[in-house]
């Protein structure tokens, strides 16, 4: 529907079948699919106990971009998968993410492409639904998106905020970035400090979970306040100190980005 060139499916034991109105062949392994179709991207929709092995299989087959939608992948499994993909040079987005979309060009994942508008604002988020909300807020003020990606809300993910910010900074079609984080961990704080030292484009930030009680997981596996500077208030303060325009509410994202671009 969005123009993504789907050339193969992989399900062990079901090789030889045809799906999607008989247009797409199914293979028993990623290696076989890659050999037959030259596929260079893998999107993973397998149950949590098997997701990490699917990531490793794609990497071993030489696939350079892997998007894992699956939520609930065991942490120990992801430790192993992360080590392997880091050594192989595979770019993993996720797990527990909605994927990535370059507007009017290609979609990898489950994002509702119809809400997007082509433009020059990058969107980077741990949350799928907040990614969509940010896109909606941008469109409401007349701003389009270059690329939007959800990096995932699990403790161990393939592409970090800094990784994505580096790509947006180098992207000639991106003039500003919306950065959406949440409570728990240090990724947002590290990203904010990287922005201060390296980013030439305006960044608008939002942190979800301001009302979360300490010690209780809120939605994502990584969204838990353990004390120190991993609360929403602490992250918002650090973002502000690093020159990021911080939103108190997601409803401010569009207006804040419009003002940042005009400045």
Describe each model-derived feature in a short phrase:
Residues 1-263:
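Catalytic-core regions of core metabolic enzymes
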């Amino acid at each position: 529907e969005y123009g993504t060139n789907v050339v193969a499916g992989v399900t062990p034991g079901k090789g030889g079948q045809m799906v999607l109105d008989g247009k797409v062949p199914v293979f028993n392994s990623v290696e076989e699919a890659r050999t037959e179709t030259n596929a260079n991207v893998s999107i993973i929709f397998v149950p949590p106990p098997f997701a990490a092995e699917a990531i490793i299989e794609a990497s071993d087959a030489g696939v350079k971009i892997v998007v894992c939608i699956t939520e609930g992948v065991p942490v120990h499994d992801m430790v192993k998968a992360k080590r392997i993909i880091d050594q192989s040079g595979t770019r993993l987005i996720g797990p527990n993410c909605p994927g990535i979309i370059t507007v009017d060009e290609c979609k990898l994942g489950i994002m509702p492409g119809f809400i997007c508008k082509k433009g020059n604002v990058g969107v980077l988020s741990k949350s799928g639904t907040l990614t969509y909300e940010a896109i909606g807020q941008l469109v409401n003020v007349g701003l389009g998106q270059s690329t939007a990606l959800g990096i995932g809300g699990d403790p161990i993910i393939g592409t970090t905020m800094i990784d994505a910010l580096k790509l947006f900074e180098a992207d000639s079609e991106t003039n500003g970035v919306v950065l959406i984080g949440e409570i728990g961990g240090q990724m947002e704080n590290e990203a904010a400090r990287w922005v201060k030292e390296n980013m030439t484009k305006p960044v608008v930030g939002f942190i979800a979970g301001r009302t979360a009680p300490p010690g209780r997981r809120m939605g994502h596996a990584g969204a838990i306040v353990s004390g120190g500077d991993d609360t929403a208030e602490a992250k918002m303060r650090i973002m502000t100190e690093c020159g990021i325009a911080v939103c108190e509410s997601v409803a401010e994202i569009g207006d804040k980005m419009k003002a940042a671009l005009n400045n």
